[in-house]
Amino acid sequence: MAQFIINFIPGIIKSIAMEGYFFVTGQAQESWFYDSPLSKKGLNQAEGLASFLGESLDYKTPKEQELIKILIGDSPSQLVSSNLRRAISTMAVGFQARLNKNLQNDSIVILSELQEISRNPDALTILTTKGSKLQCAWTDPPFLEHILMHRTDTSLHQGNKPIDSNGFKRLQAFCDLVFSDNLKKDAVIAAGHSLWFRSFFQTYLPYSFEHISKKKKLINGGCVGLVLQRVKTKEGTFKYMIDPKSITVLYGGF
């Protein structure tokens, strides 16, 4: 307990000081408590993903080649991200080469459905609802400004998760969206958060199927490919399931 208090109090003091700094310097849209930006460690991890996506495909398996071609934009796919800044920045840095190609209709679609499953303040977005332009956080590298301003799409963003929402509702809503006309491409590349993804695997993998993704968190910048299946029930509702055989760890892992 003493160790926790010793570590906790300086962090609180630093956070309050940063909030005051943002206020007096006219950066009221910034925050240290809420929607924490990408850290230096997170930036390095995202750069690691960017380097991986720039590697030759010569020594990859056929399945890995197929998935990486989707990631780099050689095969049709849609980029989507949580509405939290650290997820958006991770995707923007990791996929910078693809986004800088200026492929037609290629942008990061911001989704409330991918918002982290947590009550912590840093899991609350400070982004406004649909139609807003994104700005760099104070920790973001300058080159992200163009991507955030011109290669993001907030038309489907619904703001912060509602009070009556929960993790399962957002998981289901995301699956519904993947199969909807709003995301018309067959492949979807999602940037999100560790608890959200672990819950996703726990919910949609068969109950009896043992896999590390149900117990461990996906590391920041990690990439895993899978096939999400949809089945219509007799009642007319949809159920979703991850094909266990389709899970392919491409980078980072759990």
Whereabouts are the PLM-identified features?
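Catalytic metal-binding/acid-base residues of hydrolase active sites
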Residues: R85, L114, L195
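Generic beta-sheet signal
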Residues: S77, L183-L195
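Active-site-proximal alpha-helix that buttresses catalytic centers in soluble enzyme cores
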Residues: M1-L111, H157-D164, F168, K214-G222
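A short, acidic, amphipathic alpha-helical segment used as a generic capping/interface helix at domain edges
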Residues: G167-L183
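Extended, charge-rich low-complexity interaction segments
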Residues: C136-I163, V249-F254
